[in-house]
Amino acid sequence: MMNIFQNTFVTLGLGLCLVFIPNCRGNIIATEEELADYGWVMYEENNYLEAREWFGDAIKKDTLYNDSYNGMGWTMGHLRQADSSVHYFEKFLAMDTSFFNILDFYAGLSFAYNALGKNSEARTNCNIFFGKQNLILNPGWEFSHNKKINYLDVRLIQAVSEFRLALFENCQESINQIYKDSGSSTIVDEDYTTVTGRSNLATHLATLQDELQNS
């Protein structure tokens, strides 16, 4: 439902090989970082099948390199394989949670679980995401490989999950947080114990989704 899941530098030698020498991919010895970097190049060009191959090779090269799993998780989401997306994100998180781009993983998990209709898991990962994001010290998270995806999208997933779980008070709070963080003066105060109030919350969710998709 979203426009879903920084380093895209590729060494000159690898880049020239890929551009000018057919079928040379198997004749070079690339590091896991170079393999993952080129996977991101393919990802940013919307070539997700190729991206999957490069991230897969990077994982085979080094099973402990976090950005390979990150790339694979986001790529599988674009290939409509949300269960595989969850697998790669969670597989690495089971090994390590101390790396710098961890918010990418929890954002990706939030989107993937939402796509699977697992609202409780989606909300849990949203909560972990916001628990680890420090807006005082750092600007709000945005996905470095698609700057249109940011922490407001994660907040929307949280609000949608809360609505589906009938946590309407929490949903309203999340909606208001999105408006506040977006610089809007809108304040939602619905009687969510009524059908009309819940319907109005759903309308706000749809409006915010459209605004974020078109921002």
Question: Which role fits each region the language model picked out?
Answer:
Residues 30-57, 61:
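Alpha-helical segment of the N-proximal tetratricopeptide repeat
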Residues 33, 67, 74, 101-104, ...:
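Start-of-helix register in tetratricopeptide repeats
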Residues 44-45, 78-79, 112-115, 164:
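Register position in tetratricopeptide repeats
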Residues 148-215:
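Terminal, low-structured helical/coil segments at or just beyond the last alpha-helical repeat
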